[in-house]
Design a protein with these regions (language model features):
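Polar, enzyme-active/binding microenvironments
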Residues: 1-120
Length: 120
């Protein structure tokens, strides 16, 4: 990871070529939530690389993806957040605001297929 995170608590998603990790927090002290997105290239060994940033910092985002887009929803900063962000997995850059979750969540779980995703 580009920044050491003692306890990850981030959301992960992937395409067939890249894996992304977003959010989480730096621990030990000073305890700080982050908005970082890192990626790895699945077919090669090596360190992760900076992908970009989420729109807000936080730990515990749920994540979904298909082969093109990764979506991160909900997080804790320090209160629960409704924000949903998305990225285009094939290109690096900052996340874009997708909208808001109907309810406020953190420490979400997500799953998806090639057509849509669910978060809880």
């Amino acid at each position: 990871m580009t920044t050491s995170r003692g306890n990850m608590d981030g959301g992960m998603c992937a395409s067939t070529t890249r894996g992304l990790l977003a959010g989480g927090y730096v621990n030990p002290s000073p305890y700080a939530r982050v908005n970082l997105i890192d990626f790895i290239t699945i077919a090669t060994t090596g360190n992760s690389t900076d992908f970009g940033d989420l729109t807000v910092t936080g730990q515990g985002p749920g994540a979904n993806s298909n082969s093109l887009r990764g979506v991160f929803g909900g997080r804790n900063n320090p209160s629960k957040q409704q924000v949903i962000d998305f990225v285009e997995i094939a290109t690096t850059g900052n996340a874009v605001d997708f909208g808001d979750m109907l309810n406020v969540f953190s420490d979400c779980a997500g799953t998806s297929d090639s057509h849509g995703g669910l978060a809880e």
